[in-house]
């Protein structure tokens, strides 16, 4: 998760003899995360696919065919939550489960995050009649930002938060 990323930066800095510089980097990343939390306080409920607290129901599509997403073991669940969303697959066992199209249809996401890569440029066909597709709530985030738990996760967090709640980032 994000806290572990920041701890790892500091630990590596200590090991490599650059503890002060590493701490400054980790501190700056933590400040960016804290700024997102401040902006996302008091989310307005503005759509039918939002929870009562304003969080958006999100499906993260890692691969279009076969359809892979994030499950309970993925660090990306925390990222979606910190960005003002709730992963509709957070309770599925495994970190990156393959799911059926029937399961995907039943999830009813309000937004779809695509891990942007050449084989994952659009939502799986199972979502063609979903609210997310009909309302154009399909967002691409560079796969390099999402695929590794490192400093770039903060960039991904900022992008996802802006996509899910553009009204808060004017």
PLM regions and their residue ranges:
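Binding-cleft/active-site segments that stabilize strongly anionic ligands or cofactors
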Residues: 1-3, 27, 32-154, 168-169
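Flexible loop/hinge segments that line or gate small-molecule binding clefts
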Residues: 1-15
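Mid-sequence acidic-hydrophobic segments that form the walls
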Residues: 12-15, 19, 32
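Short, hydrophobic alpha-helical segments
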Residues: 16, 164-169
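Structural signature of PLP-dependent enzymes
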Residues: 21-27
């Amino acid at each position: 998760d994000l806290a572990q990323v920041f701890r790892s930066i500091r630990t590596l800095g200590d090991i490599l003899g650059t503890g002060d510089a590493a701490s400054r980097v980790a501190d700056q990343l933590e400040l960016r995360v804290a700024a997102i939390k401040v902006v996302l306080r008091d989310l307005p409920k503005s759509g039918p696919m939002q929870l009562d607290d304003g969080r958006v129901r999100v499906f993260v599509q890692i691969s279009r065919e076969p359809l892979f997403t994030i499950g309970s073991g993925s660090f990306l669940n925390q990222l979606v939550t910190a960005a003002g969303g709730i992963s509709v697959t957070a309770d599925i066992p495994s970190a990156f489960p393959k799911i059926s199209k029937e399961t995907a249809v039943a999830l009813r996401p309000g937004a779809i995050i695509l891990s942007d890569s050449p084989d994952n440029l659009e939502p799986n066909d199972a979502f063609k009649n979903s609210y997310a597709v009909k309302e154009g709530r399909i967002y691409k985030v560079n796969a390099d930002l999402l695929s590794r738990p490192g400093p770039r996760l903060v960039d991904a967090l900022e992008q996802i938060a802006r996509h899910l709640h553009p009204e808060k980032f004017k």
